[in-house]
């Protein structure tokens, strides 16, 4: 088992909490999803480290001790952290999950990457406004419901709505400690949900992306699979890896097959 090391780094744009597995391997940046954090990715990071990678998992803006006060949006702050870590570590490969996949795609043109691996990135701009209209409307209503609950002081209900749509485990089946942790993050989860929904991806972002592998599971929400399909239309050098029996939280819940897919995609 690869030992985890962590540190808080003061940068020119804020402070970043970084967790590291496998300090002797080739550097690989791994960006987490909303409502999670670096420690949740320990099993996946250990698998990647055992395969010879130094897995670097930053806490994105607002998570742990990471703060980027000057960013215009949360998503820009997440991308700034990804760019910084890839640059200082010399990483030539980046893996992103969900919101972390969006941040990774936005960061990619600013760093010298040989490979980008995205597990169900949140890419609303890749959806077809007509063909995916019902899915877009349902997601917008979910975000609005989350905001209403948060405004009324019902933090648990706000994050429960999110979990019931995007997580593989129903809210009632989560351990009490997990529900408490998620409830404490409600404001940040709502903010991330709103921020990711409003991102427009410039054409040059798509065209500048390095060779990219998109991974998706057959148990994920339909909108996640449609985002992957849309991204395939925009990315000039992309391949897709479907996984059977895997949902949107596969990097946390089905670490084995997800790790195998990531390792197969890495150079």
Task: Label every model-predicted segment.
Residues 12-67:
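Conserved HGGG/HGGXW glycine-rich cap/lid loop of the alpha/beta-hydrolase fold
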Residues 151-190:
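Conserved alpha/beta-hydrolase catalytic His-Asp/Glu region
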């Amino acid at each position: 088992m690869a030992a985890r090391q962590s540190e808080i780094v003061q940068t020119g744009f804020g402070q970043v909490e970084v967790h590291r597995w496998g300090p002797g391997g080739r550097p690989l940046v791994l960006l987490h999803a909303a409502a999670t954090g670096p420690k949740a990715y320990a099993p996946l990071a250990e698998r990647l480290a055992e395969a010879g990678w130094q897995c670097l998992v930053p806490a994105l803006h607002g998570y742990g001790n990471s703060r980027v006060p000057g960013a215009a949006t949360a998503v820009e702050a997440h991308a700034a952290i990804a760019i910084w870590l890839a640059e200082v570590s010399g990483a030539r490969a980046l893996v992103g999950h969900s919101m972390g996949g969006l941040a990774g795609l936005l960061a990619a043109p600013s760093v010298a990457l040989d490979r980008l691996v995205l597990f169900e990135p949140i890419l609303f701009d890749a959806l077809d406004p007509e063909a995916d209209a019902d899915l877009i409307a349902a997601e917008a209503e979910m975000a609005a419901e989350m905001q209403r609950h948060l405004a009324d002081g019902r933090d648990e209900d706000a994050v429960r709505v999110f979990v019931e749509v995007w997580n593989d485990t129903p809210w009632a089946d989560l351990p009490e400690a997990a529900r408490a942790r998620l409830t404490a993050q409600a404001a940040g989860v709502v903010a991330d949900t709103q921020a990711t929904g409003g991102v427009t991806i410039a054409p040059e972002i798509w065209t500048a992306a390095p060779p990219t592998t998109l991974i998706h599971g057959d148990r994920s929400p339909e909108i996640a699979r449609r985002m992957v399909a849309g991204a395939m239309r925009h990315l000039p050098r992309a391949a897709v890896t479907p996984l059977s029996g895997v949902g949107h939280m596969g990097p946390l819940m089905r670490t084995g097959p997800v790790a195998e897919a990531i390792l197969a995609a890495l150079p």
